[in-house]
Amino acid sequence: MILTVTLNTALDLTYGVPALVPHTSHRVGDISERPGGKGLNVARVLSALGHETVVTGFAGGATGAVLRDLLAGLPPRDALVAVTGNTRRTIAVVDASTGDTTQLNEPGPLVTAGEWAAFLTTYRELLGEADAVALCGSLPPGIHVGAYAELVRLARAADVPVLLDTSGEPLRRGIAARPDLIKPNADELAQLTGSREPLRATRDAR
């Protein structure tokens, strides 16, 4: 089983408009919604390729309920942990005249210490079933910046290969815990190392 972790899950909303014009009202045409966040997107692809996949992270409030209803019809197994706050929404507005997309991302729910502890219990249990784990995306409010480093160490202690896909200080601290793989893009790697030369930045990140 492949485990994907999305601490800051999202309900992805996409609105299609004929043309996005500032300072005007728009009539939305096409509307779609789906479970989102990096780890959920990874799980969706892995499931489509035939891999047994489990998703964990946080979901809460009315938005989280919609997200979990949508997950119920998909192959990844839902092992999300409930929180009191509302799961965030990401809103993509697609301009049909240009094909351009404008993205709006909410910050996510405030996760309490008790909710984090409940997640760690679930995570440890799932590691016992996992052949690999992918830790993906941003951290919601309330989660300490070294959270991914903690999760990497737990995976390594369980002898489970771990991939880390995040950015900024959570990535820097996560790398120090020695994940098996990291997946920064060019901007994230430059932010981490101060270099925009890919080979040098990769060496510096190590």
Language-model regions, residue ranges each:
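Glycine-rich phosphate/adenosyl-contacting loop at the front of the ribokinase-like
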Residues: 1-56, 65-66
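General beta-strand structural signal in soluble alpha/beta enzymes
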Residues: 5, 79-80, 134-135, 162-166, ...
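Glycine-rich beta-alpha junction loops
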Residues: 7-11, 59-60, 85-87, 188
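Short, charged, surface-exposed secondary-structure boundary motifs
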Residues: 14-15, 114, 191-196
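Aromatic/hydrophobic pocket-lining residues that form π-stacking "cages" and hydrophobic walls in ligand
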Residues: 42-43, 67, 123, 151, ...
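Conserved N-terminal subdomain of the carbohydrate kinase-like
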Residues: 47-131
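Glycine-rich phosphate-binding loops at beta-strand->alpha-helix junctions
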Residues: 138-143
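Conserved phosphate/ATP/ADP-binding segment of small-molecule kinases
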Residues: 146-206
